[in-house]
Amino acid sequence: MKPGKTLRSISALLPVILLAGCATYGAGVTGAIQDVQKGDYAASEAKFQKALNPSGNDRLLYHMELAVVKHLEGDFAASNVLLDKAERIAEDLETTSITGSVVTLMSNPRQGPYGGADFEKVFINYYKALNYFGLAQLATDRNGYYDALEGA
């Protein structure tokens, strides 16, 4: 194959690779978000579980999204369990491979593990604090109230 032909072949394939990378996170969870807006948390949870993988590349988003659904349902303890997992996942994903990052950037951001943006890491602790305040409000005795506030 001639050098010019190789260059043209690569030039023709590059847009295909880049366009394949345009799949967005939002397309997979639109239905779940709509259910949250309607207050149908059970349906939303099922759709998030179907759209996101708890052990795959989007495991951070899986735990964060479900934690918010649990928070909105008023299940503050379950929300905190999910947020604790999300926090550990975010910390584990802090270290990334340069090669893996370049390949992910060139193809599809959802092909590599998502480590979360800085504001999302703050979001984890913000919701944990809200959950502890919610637990304090639901506490039936003084010790439960203080234990929940101490967690915040």
Model regions: which residues?
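Bacterial Sec signal peptide processing site at the extreme N-terminus
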Residues: 20-43, 50-54
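Residue signature of alpha-solenoid helical repeat architecture, marking inter-repeat boundaries
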Residues: 57, 118-119, 126
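Inward-facing hydrophobic residues that define packing positions of alpha-helical scaffold repeats
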Residues: 48-49, 83, 90, 145, ...
